[in-house]
Structures are given as structure tokens and as C-alpha cells.
Amino acid sequence: MNEMNEAAVRSGWLRCAEAARLVRWGAAIAMSAAVLAGCGSMRQTAAPTLAASDAVAIAPIANFTETPAAGGSAAALAATILRANGLADVRLAPVDGDGNAMFDTAQRDTGERRLAWAREHHVKYVLAGAVEEWRYKAGVDGEPVAGLTFELVGVESGRVVWSAAGTRSGWSRSSLSSVANALVGRLLAPLRPRS
């Protein structure tokens, strides 16, 4: 009888130890999620229904930072991610002859010039945007940080059909390109064809 009591006590202790271990793991996962969630923020509207064959032109992305070519880097990332999302016809819109962005979002040119080019090239949507932040923070750690806004304009209506804004920062050993890639990927994730 005494052996049965000892076995029951041991079994109870083992269950308690297992439960404590699961609680510790759960707490560690919750803390990790909280830390990662604090690394950025994102806001966006509902995405339109896209077909894999819809042509999307990426307008030159405005660069409101002190980092040279941040807009070009963001546009290249956006084009690659949209293709990876399943859109077959993703194009980079040209700059004009003076080297100026054809779709200068700094001047909020949403007029006929942008839409006329898109119509002439049988584009259904134009993705415009701006880089708000693209740098390494000053200080000992020098964490990378990126901030972007995007607007998807329906060429037929000339109206914004989807928009998103987001920021993301990394740790001191992260690269700016990996932080920017993750941010652009999350922002553009809803822009994928639906079957």
C-alpha cells in the first residue's frame, strides 16, 4: 500500500513539473511575441481582388529621407515581392527625360499624366509610394529602421483602391535591407491574386 502512495505522489509531482515547464515555455513564447510586436507597426485598408494577369506598374517611390536611392531600393523590393505574391505582369514605370520621377508623389501628382501612361501601356493598377525612413539609428547599437507608405491606384477610375503604411526596426546585428524586405513583404502581402 505504501508503494502505491509513493507512486501516486511521484506521478503527481511529475505532472506538476510538466505543467510548470509548459507554463515557462508559454511565458517565453508570449514574451518573444511581445518583443517582436514592438518592432514596428502597420496600417492598411482592405485589398482589392486581383487576378494573376492584372498588370501592375510600380511608380518611382518618393524618397523623403536623407538616404540616397532609398526610393529606388523600395521600388525594386516592391516589384520582386509582388511577383513572388503571384502577379505575373509587374513593371517599373519610367522616369521622364529630365530624370524626374514620372509620378512624383512629393508633389502628389495624381493627374492625367500618370493615368495616361498607364492606360497607354494597358496597366490595370499603379503602385505609388513614399519612403519616410530608411536608415540606421544613431547611437551605440545603430539599429536599422524603415518606414514606407504605399497606394494602389486603379487606372480605370483614377482612385486609390488600397493603401498601407508601416514601420519596422531591427536589432543592432540586423541589416537595413532585411528590415526593409520584411516591411515591404508585410505591407504588400494582401496584394496577391485570389483564385
Model-predicted regions and their roles:
Residues 63-66, 96-99, 132-137, 168-171:
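Solvent-exposed loop/turn segments at secondary-structure junctions
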Residues 52-53, 60, 65-121, 159-163, ...:
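N-terminal segment of the mature soluble domain
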Residues 39-54, 75-76, 87, 117-121, ...:
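C-terminal/domain-edge helix-coil "capping" segments
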Residues 26, 65-69, 170, 174, ...:
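Charge-dense, low-complexity intrinsically disordered segments
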Residues 94, 152-153:
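Hydrophobic beta-strand positions
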Residues 6, 131-133, 188-190:
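Short, positively charged
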Residues 1-39:
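Sec-dependent bacterial lipoprotein signal peptides
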